Amino acid sequence: MKLPIYLDYSATTPVDPRVAEKMMQCLTLDGTFGNPASRSHRFGWQAEEAVDIARNQIAELVGADPREIVFTSGATEADNLAIKGAANFYQKKGKHIITSKTEHKAVLDTCRQLEREGFDVTYLAPQRNGIIDLVELEAAMREDTILVSIMHVNNEIGVVQDIAAIGEMCRSRGIVFHVDATQSVGKLPIDLSQLKVDLMSFSGHKIYGPKGIGALYVRRKPRIRLEAQMHGGGHERGMRSGTLPVHQIVGMGEAYRIAKEEMTAEMDRLSMLRDRLWNGINDIEEVYLNGDIEQGVPNILNVSFNYVEGESLIMALKDLAVSSGSACTSASLEPSYVLRALGMNDELAHSSIRFSLGRFTTEEEIDYTIELVRKSIGRLRDLSPLWEMFKQGVDISSIEWAHH
């Protein structure tokens, strides 16, 4: 077993060797290196064919028509294109958007930008387990609501939203429904031929494909219109200009093909490993599971260890690559905004660790993790005056600390 152990698969995944091999065939002179928009020679045709195959592989995993897949530079761009594109196109119908407080920053900050441009955004607070209350969502819908954006799976706590039910609510009112599926694609079955979802964002690098590539699903029936955000040569049916990066697209396609083949067995395996990890640490005193194990994906476990500082815990666990909060915001010492939105106090939010498992995680690594976490928590609490006070029955929240 090699140290450190990678348990941060929700931040990014290593590229699967089968994916890397396919990508290598699209880079050099003897490979498929052409520009797919070059219609006048074989190099262009071959590149276009490689892109078509990948587009089909992605569409097949999610039950879409390949013509509904628009390539972007990643899920962040897909979220921006979906939300800004739909808001700008449909603004004559209304300027009200609904999202939730636990969305990824790519959705939240896009909505903030639209607020600066005169749109009105409602940010729903989820229930304590992270699930959106559908009654509250329905109550927030107005005559001028044009767009609802709710993620499928949360990147920090792994809870799954009922996008089928939300889709029905939106469709019956003629509201465009966008779903960020970055963390769910390849982990949960998605069938866009059945779901009433209009726009869906995908990433390559969360599913053993390369970084720098993503896609946006844009429904054809009923047809959803977007205002382009990237202008140029009119690629991707005018929705996203820019020369298509064939090697990245081929890599993403192969990653989605593998996911379709292996998803069911792999999720059973990860479910077992996640349960093994949770069962190995849940008897430690003052340990809390964040989210909802029943309504969660099998690869994410977010746990708070009360009376232990999250940063010191991460230092103690230096043989484990884990995160507190998401990678996109973890450089700041602010506690996770997702956990705060669940109504958690700052101290408990600060002591949270996200373990995310993946394709190359082994049982041996999980057992090592359990042992290391148990030892580290014990050691850090031995050093903690707060833990000592808690053990003596002092109500820490009632203490007034002196400020120097």
Curated annotation (Swiss-Prot):
Its EC number is 2.8.1.7. PROSITE patterns: AA_TRANSFER_CLASS_5. Its main location: cytoplasm. Pfam families: Aminotran_5. The active site is at 328 (cysteine persulfide intermediate). SUPFAM superfamilies: PLP-dependent transferases. Its cofactor is pyridoxal 5'-phosphate. It comes from the Bacteria. One of its GO terms (biological process) is [2Fe-2S] cluster assembly. Master enzyme that delivers sulfur to a number of partners involved in Fe-S cluster assembly, tRNA modification or cofactor biosynthesis. Catalyzes the removal of elemental sulfur atoms from cysteine to produce alanine. Functions as a sulfur delivery protein for Fe-S cluster synthesis onto IscU, an Fe-S scaffold assembly protein, as well as other S acceptor proteins. This is Cysteine desulfurase IscS. It comes from Pectobacterium atrosepticum (strain SCRI 1043 / ATCC BAA-672) (Erwinia carotovora subsp. atroseptica). The lineage of its organism: Bacteria, Pseudomonadati, Pseudomonadota, Gammaproteobacteria, Enterobacterales.
